[in-house]
Amino acid sequence: MKELLGKQALVTGTTGIGRAIAMRLAAGGAQVVACGIDTIANAELARAAADLHLAVEVEACDVTDLEGMRSVVRTTVSRFGGLDIIVNAAAIHPFGNAVETDLETWNRCMMVNVGSIFILAHLGIPEMKKRGGGSIINLASVQGYACQRGVVAYAASKGAIHSLTRALALDHAPDNIRVNSISPGSIATPMLARSAAHFSPDEDVAQVFSRFGAAHPLGRIGTPEEVAELAAFLASDKAGFCTGGDYLVDGGLLAGLAVQ
C-alpha cells in the first residue's frame, strides 16, 4: 500500500536504520532524499534503491554543517516540490566514561546526534509549514532510559533526543507538525557490530549478537526493517494524533528487570 504517496522525505544516515527507513518510505510511495557522510554507504544505498526502482536520491553531507544541510533541504524542495517528512537517523557511538572521553569527542557526539536534529528543525520546519504540516521522526535509543557502562556521551545524547523531541512537538503542534522519537533496543546494524567488537573483542560478532538478543524478552535482536515499519507509520497520516511520544522497538527489553 502506498500510504506515503505524494510525500517528500529527507532522511539523515545511510547505513543501518537510516538506510532501511529511506527504502521503506520510498516503498510506501514517498520521494526521498537520503544523506550521509559515508561515501561507500551512500553508493550502496543508491544502488539498492535503483535496483528496486525506488525514488531515493542520495546526497553526501555532514549533518553538523549548517550551510551544507541548508543546501540539502533546498535540494529536496527543488527536486520534489516540498518537504513533508524528516527522519533524523544519523548518529555516532563513541565509547568511554567521563574520564576517558575527551571534550572533542563529547562535543562531536552531541553535535551529530542532537545538534543535527536542531539544525534540520531550524531549516526544515519553515518548509513543512508551507505544506500545511509534516512529521519529524528522531532516532533515539533505549540507552536514553537505561544505559550500559562506558557510553557516557552516547547515552547522554540519546536522553537529550527525548527531551528535544517533546520540546519540538509542543512548539510546533499549532503548525500541524508532529514530532516523535523511536527508541530501538539492540538492532542488527554496523553500529551494533562495532559495539560488539568493542565490548567483546575475543568473541565472534554473531555470538555477541546472540548474547545481546538473549537479554531481550523476545529472545533476539531486531532488524532495521522492523524499526523502519514504525517510522513509516509515524510518517503517515495514520499517525495523525501521535506527537511528542517516544516509541520502543526493543523486544521488551525495558519491560523487565536486569536482575534474573
Predicted regions and their residues:
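Canonical Rossmann dinucleotide-binding motif of NAD(H)/NADP(H)-dependent dehydrogenases/reductases
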Residues: 3-33
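Conserved glycine-rich Rossmann-like NAD(P)H-binding loop of the short-chain dehydrogenase/reductase
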Residues: 30-44
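Substrate-binding pocket helix/loop in short-chain dehydrogenase/reductase
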Residues: 97-98, 105-107, 208, 212
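Active-site helix of classical SDR
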Residues: 121, 157, 165
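Alpha-helical segment proximal to the catalytic Tyr-Lys
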Residues: 126, 170-174, 240
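Short C-terminal tail/terminal secondary-structure segment
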Residues: 146, 232, 243-260
